[in-house]
């Protein structure tokens, strides 16, 4: 792919569902090799924004470019990994078969073992997904998103149901991937995870209220804790 400055370049994106404006003029630019966190409560617009980046949601207004290409564009998806909030897996297949399926789509079945080992599922690779716990299904879904070693990784609440020890391991891996050039956009409402990001975007009512490093956001709000900064900076009406 080309080497543009931004892996994600979305401008003035608007998305309406009936009378509800899920995205209200969002502009988002994420540099290559950056870990960017979307922080906000449920219903803030995080999932809709991520789905618009991958081309699953068509905005009413605005533009979305990913890896230098205007979305939606099928060829770009070969370079994008996307993990949904709810595991999109085949319940009657094993964990290994699920990851192999997604690897085959991208012609990267050689990455199956690495992906399963990363999420600590190699020992359970023969287990049918329907028999796995919710946390294990989350990990399997993440392995499917990682199997083809994407240039851009879009993660919607990737550590829900994951135990604290594995959460730390996953974030260590995310940081290593970013150091190797992978761009990661991750949504979360967990403050300690937000602290691991290079930059954050605080989102509520479909608006991107503030952006910057954790230190910059705290300074902008004039507080010492990220939770307090989010509460102070999100004191806006939905109108």
Language-model features: where?
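Conserved ABC transporter NBD signature motif
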Residues: 62-76
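Catalytic Walker B motif of ABC-type/P-loop ATPase nucleotide-binding domains
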Residues: 153-157
